[in-house]
């Protein structure tokens, strides 16, 4: 089972809010997920990004691949550097 760390959309129309989740790559964007890692709210200025760093590092060590958007957010938070070190 290939796993991805990706964003699942929530919130109302025109007011997006995202959950950072670990999910099987075959499941739908907002469908079944394995574990919730945090939240991302792009509507705030600046955008609010909360993560459980320990869980993220654990899943990265297990081989979960972040999507491009999540990879950028992890770089901004400095978590991706810890995973590669």
UniProtKB/Swiss-Prot annotation:
Q: Which Gene3D superfamilies match?
A: 3.30.1320.10
Keywords assigned by UniProt, alphabetized: Ribonucleoprotein, Ribosomal protein
Q: Which InterPro entries match?
A: Ribosomal_bS16 (IPR000307), Ribosomal_bS16_CS (IPR020592), Ribosomal_bS16_dom_sf (IPR023803)
> What's a Pfam family this protein contains?
Ribosomal_S16
PROSITE patterns in the cross-refs: RIBOSOMAL_S16
Q: Which domain of life is it from?
A: Bacteria
Q: Which GO terms describe its cellular component?
A: cytoplasm; small ribosomal subunit
GO annotation terms (biological process): translation
The protein's GO terms of the molecular function aspect are: structural constituent of ribosome
What family does the entry list? Answer: Belongs to the bacterial ribosomal protein bS16 family.
Q: Which HAMAP family match?
A: Ribosomal_bS16
Q: What is this protein called?
A: Small ribosomal subunit protein bS16
């Amino acid at each position: 089972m290939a796993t991805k760390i990706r964003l699942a959309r929530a919130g109302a129309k025109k007011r997006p809010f995202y959950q950072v989740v670990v999910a099987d790559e075959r499941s739908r964007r907002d469908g079944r997920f394995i574990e919730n890692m945090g939240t991302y709210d792009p509507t705030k200025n600046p955008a609010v990004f909360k993560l459980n760093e320990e869980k993220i590092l654990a899943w990265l060590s297990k081989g979960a691949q972040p999507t491009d958007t999540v990879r950028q957010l992890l770089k901004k938070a400095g978590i991706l550097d810890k995973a590669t070190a």
